[in-house]
């Protein structure tokens, strides 16, 4: 009797981001260089040049990528941006952030030690996707986090609740 097929394939988690990019080959190389991603799979598109599907491993997580095909899926450039941020936890946020900028990302929020306990910053990749990069530095209780958030956000202007 054949073994039961797993509902979630080996190496994947329950939730796996699947992004659309223009120039998927360049995006794959960027993610490898900037974030240390490992290419796991690649399926060429019908023209033999584009990427219909690719899988990259970031630590213990997977990211699926496909080329923009206007009749099926559109990139952030085609729709005027993306409201989604891909969050990446790493051992050394400073090193990864610098490497990503050197590889072509644009820093949009410099790295800083944040009130929730992470060293955290944000950047945009050359393909229209926003990334946050963080290293968890300190465990913070929900109460400590709420207090620190209030201090971080500062006093509210008069008449505002």
Model-derived regions: residue spans:
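C-terminal catalytic core of tyrosine-transesterase DNA break-rejoin enzymes
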Residues: 127
């Amino acid at each position: 009797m054949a073994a039961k097929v797993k509902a979630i394939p080996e190496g994947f988690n329950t939730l796996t981001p699947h992004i659309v990019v223009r120039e998927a080959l360049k995006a794959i190389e960027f993610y490898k260089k900037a974030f240390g991603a490992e290419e796991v799979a690649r399926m060429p598109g019908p023209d033999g040049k584009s990427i219909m599907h690719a899988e990259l491993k970031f630590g213990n997580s997977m990211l699926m990528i496909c080329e923009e095909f206007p009749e099926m899926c559109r990139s952030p450039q085609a729709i005027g941006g993306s409201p989604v941020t891909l969050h990446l936890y790493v051992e050394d946020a400073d090193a990864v952030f610098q490497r990503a900028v050197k590889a072509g990302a644009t820093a949009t929020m410099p790295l800083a030690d944040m009130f929730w306990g992470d060293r955290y910053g944000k950047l945009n990749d050359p393909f229209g996707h926003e990334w946050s990069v963080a290293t968890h530095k300190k465990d913070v209780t929900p109460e400590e986090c709420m207090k620190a958030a209030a201090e971080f956000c500062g006093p509210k202007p008069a008449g505002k609740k």
